[in-house]
C-alpha cells in the first residue's frame, strides 16, 4: 500500500497502478455537480478562478452538516460519472486527482491518460467512517451551494484505491 501526499507529483502519479490501495494525506477539495458547472463556466468565460487546482485532488463529495464537536459531517463519495462532462476542462486546468465512486467514461479515461492524472475510488456508504480521516474542513467557494459548495479538507491516511491509473487502465 502506498502512502502519498498532496499536491500530487508526476512521479507519484506515474508509480500508481490500477487496483492498488492508497492512503492519501494533505489537502483535497470537495466539488459536486453544481460546483463543477460553475468552475467550467469560469474557465469558458475566462473569469477569475476561486482557487488554484494545479496538481490538486477533487473529491466528488457534498458533506452533510457538521455535528457539534466534529470536524465534518458524513462525507462519502458521489457518482463520478455525473462529473464526466466537466472533467476534461478541469484536467486541462491542472487537476491531477479525482476521488469518487463508479465508472468513468472512455473520454474521461483518455483524458486522464493524456494529462497523466489519476482517478481514485473510495468506499460508498461509509461517509461517517471517512469523516474520521478529515482533520480540518473549511468552506472556500460557492457558499450559496450549501453542501455542494467547495470545501478544503485536510485529510490524513484517507483510504483509496486506484480506479484509473495514468496509463488509462481501469478497474472496470
Segments from the language model and where they lie:
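Feature captures the catalytic cores and cofactor-binding loops of soluble hydro-lyases/lyases
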Residues: 30-31, 35-158
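Short, structured beta-strand/loop micro-motifs enriched in basic residues and often containing a Trp
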Residues: 1-8
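Active-site/ligand-binding-proximal alpha/beta "capping" segment
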Residues: 85-87, 161-172
Amino acid at each position: 500500500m502506498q502512502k502519498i501526499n498532496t499536491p500530487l507529483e508526476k512521479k507519484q502519479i506515474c508509480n500508481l497502478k490500477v487496483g492498488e490501495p492508497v492512503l492519501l494525506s494533505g489537502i483535497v477539495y470537495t466539488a459536486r455537480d453544481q460546483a463543477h458547472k460553475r468552475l467550467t463556466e469560469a474557465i469558458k468565460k475566462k473569469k477569475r478562478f476561486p482557487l488554484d487546482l494545479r496538481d490538486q485532488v477533487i473529491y466528488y463529495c457534498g458533506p452533510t452538516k457538521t455535528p457539534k464537536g466534529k470536524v465534518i459531517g458524513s462525507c462519502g463519495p458521489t457518482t463520478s460519472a455525473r462529473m464526466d462532462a466537466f472533467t476534461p476542462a478541469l484536467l486541462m486546468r491542472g487537476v491531477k486527482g479525482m476521488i469518487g465512486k463508479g465508472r468513468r467514461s472512455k473520454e474521461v479515461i483518455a483524458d486522464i491518460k493524456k494529462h497523466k492524472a489519476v482517478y481514485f475510488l473510495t468506499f460508498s456508504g461509509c461517509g461517517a467512517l471517512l469523516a474520521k480521516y478529515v482533520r480540518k474542513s473549511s468552506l472556500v467557494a460557492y457558499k450559496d451551494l450549501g453542501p455542494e459548495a467547495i470545501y478544503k479538507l485536510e485529510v490524513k491516511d484517507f483510504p483509496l484505491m486506484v480506479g484509473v491509473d495514468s496509463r488509462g487502465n481501469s478497474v472496470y
